[in-house]
Amino acid sequence: MVEKTILEAVKKVVEESPKRNFSESVDLAINLKNLDMNQPKNRVDEEVILPHGLGKELKIGVFAKGDVGLKAKAAGAAYVISDVELEELAADKNRARVLANECDLFIAETQFMPIIGKNLGIVLGPRGKMPIPLMPNKDVGELIQSKQNAVKLRSKDRLTFHVAVGRRDMNPEDLAENIETIMSRLERVLDKGKHNLRTVYVTTTMGKSERVV
């Protein structure tokens, strides 16, 4: 059972925002307080699995070869980058930037990680898209599926940051449950829990916003 105030805020934002000819993202605008963000321990850097996903297919790039590459493709990876293609990307930073902008996230077999760090870190690092290492005992298909429902809560050194919680055409109850999942994680990781939350607003990409905290 989702909290009534969150559900009402979601419904109001979805119903009262002007209709668009595309499916808008629904986001949370999170404002923290009473934290020194110059201290790394106060920064939020969490991955949260949303119970109802984001309402869209994420574009995932996988650095892999052989059977792992084939399994990644079968599991829905948008791009599978072999060791040969990785060398080509390392020599063509413009192409690497295009790929980095197209993909929502990357996964890489562990043997690829040092090469990626050395040659593509300058492209992927600032975008927060350094690959998730695929450990030898992990199934690439399962990892891809879990990441389809995951979002990153990342404040960096700012008190204000945003995170997507779904799409406007999703069921309001599902959006509200996604929001509750994020709020619960935030309250757990913040030093003083909900007392470090100044405000939290739910908003659409180009529409109105409603306060939930």
UniProtKB/Swiss-Prot annotation:
One of its GO terms (molecular function) is structural constituent of ribosome. The keyword Iron-sulfur does not apply. GO terms for biological process: regulation of translation; translation. One of its GO terms (cellular component) is large ribosomal subunit. SUPFAM superfamilies: Ribosomal protein L1. Keywords: Repressor, Ribonucleoprotein, Ribosomal protein, RNA-binding, rRNA-binding, Translation regulation, tRNA-binding. Binds directly to 23S rRNA. Probably involved in E site tRNA release. Belongs to the universal ribosomal protein uL1 family. Part of the 50S ribosomal subunit. This is Large ribosomal subunit protein uL1. It comes from Methanosarcina acetivorans (strain ATCC 35395 / DSM 2834 / JCM 12185 / C2A). The lineage of its organism: Archaea, Methanobacteriati, Methanobacteriota, Stenosarchaea group, Methanomicrobia. The gene is rpl1.
